[in-house]
Amino acid sequence: PKDVVDKLQLIVMDSFGVMVSAKNEQYITSLINALKENGDCTLVGHNKKVNPFNASIINGTAIHGEDFDDTFEGTPVHVGSVMVPAILSSAQAINLDGQKFLKGLVVGSELICRLALVAPTAVHRQGFHPTAIFGAFGSSIGVSSLLGNSINEMSSGLGIVGSMASGIIEYLAEGTSTKRLHPGWAAGCGWQSANFAKSGFLGPRTVFEGQHGVFNSFAKNNIEPDFSHIISDL
């Protein structure tokens, strides 16, 4: 739908702007110095290309770095700082056009926002960063759609990324840069998990609702999850 495309284009433009604004910050230069493997994926604002995983991490960190990225007030979560770097690097890595780029953004962004509505505030109250946790799943499903993964492979990708998702909010104690890193890490894990699944690696199908799944592990247990938000109106 046009309104969805218009919103995503706005998020993409905003994300590119804040990436450029943060390009010379210490937390970005330190990541560039650490993640040096060359590849085909752009580091926005820099004359350098790296592999998809590293590009996702660095660009995602830059988008979220100064906290001017978009916000969905469901939990809340920051969609652009995960999805734009994840889909940009993936599209570049496998040489896809702008239409497929937008498709990947739609698929992943939708899942992040829906997961954020399942148990509002519960993840944050448990001590985790919702963008870091839910973002990994959006990134995984978005990248899976670009790779042409089957339904079973997409399901495995989500199960796999459940063991990669992370992000504690202890950065609040000292104001360190791990908060900035969280969306980038989630973006990179989407690339890894989708490719693992495409290659035949299996992940649990009950990653969201299972006894040891996301909402029983990362969410405050006195807030009852409503899983209908994941599939309602589809």
Locations of regions flagged by a protein language model:
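N-terminal core-entry segment
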Residues: 1-234
